[in-house]
Amino acid sequence: MNMEFKRKMPTPQAVKDMYPISADLAEQKKETDRALRDIFLGTSERLALIIGPCSADREDAVLEYICRLREVQERVKDKILIVPRVYTNKPRTTGDGYKGMLHQPDPNSSPDMLKGLIAIRKLHIRVLEQTGFSCADEMLYPENHHYLSDVLSYVAVGARSVENQLHRLTASGLDIPVGMKNPTGGNLSVMINSITAAQHPHTFVYSSWEVQSKGNPLAHAILRGLANKHGRSVPNYHYEDLQLLCELYDQSGLQNPAVVVDTNHSNSGKHWEEQPRIAKEILHSTRHSAQIGRLVKGLMIESYLEDGCQKPDGGVYGKSITDPCLGWKKTERLIYELADLR
């Protein structure tokens, strides 16, 4: 094989034993799990707001950001359930660039997967301890989910991963909401097929075990826009797009029809400052169609302490080193506006 086997990684249980969570923290996570479950089952009318940096690059800045979210959550708790994005591993379009804290716990140092694995678990635990939030992360590497399974309340499967067999089958074995993004080319039938696979039981190999999943009734759609054959961004958050997804769900017979709409990526044409307008348009659509209102369970927004983005060695505290994000002032104002619209 054309690779070097550098070292054997500790098992998920070994890492959990080294960095455990208390019974109180476990119960806090369960409370968030129950609240999210109610939203995706339709027994709660609150909006799930999955919001945070494109990538969790620095522990101190991420913690400060999420502490600010906690204060806002208390003011909007009757209308919105905030689930912070703590994305610790990043897919890269060409494979180049910063791949997240899992790969590089220090963005300016060489990759160290063992240190990264420990760093991401410690970060999620610190967030839970200091804010009470259990968070969302992307399931980029399915077999790594078990390292964080006791601290995550939401998982997204990205546009480049959604057709992958192991991602789909692993999603079928989780007991939290899993959002399946439409692929970068925008084919919604691919996304619907992924949700179908995730909602059904399967037997497969996971972490050197033969496992039997039960199926995940909380698997759902994420609309993130698409790139057409010319490479141009095309949004899929408009009223007619949501109406089409309602029809696809009706035809599919899937459990608990639901969508979370990503306001950035191809939906914004990578113009991050458009996210507030897009988010408000989506909520207006929910008010004009009862069917769309039932379907839309949440929004996904990329936000950090500072507007925009910088290079990994840029040095601006709280500014994204991957995709550009909304800064805090715009974020806070937007959350209150969304609560008023809800």
Task: Give the label of every model feature segment.
Residues A48-A61, D323:
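Conserved phosphate/anionic-ligand binding catalytic regions in large, soluble enzymes, centered on
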Residues R7, I66, K79-L244, H265-S266, ...:
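Active-site-facing alpha/beta catalytic cores
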Residues C54-D57, N256, N264-K270:
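Short acidic, Gly/Ser-rich segments with clustered Asp/Glu that frequently serve as metal-coordination loops
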Residues F40-T43, R70-K77, I125-Q130, S213, ...:
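Acidic (Asp/Glu)-rich catalytic clusters
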Residues Y304-R342:
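Internal helix-turn-beta structural module
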Residues M1-T43:
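N- or domain-start disorder-to-order transition segments that initiate the globular core
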Residues G52, V261, G327:
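Conserved, mostly hydrophobic/aromatic
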Residues L25-D38, V72-V83, N89, I120:
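N-terminal beta-rich core of secreted/periplasmic extracellular enzymes
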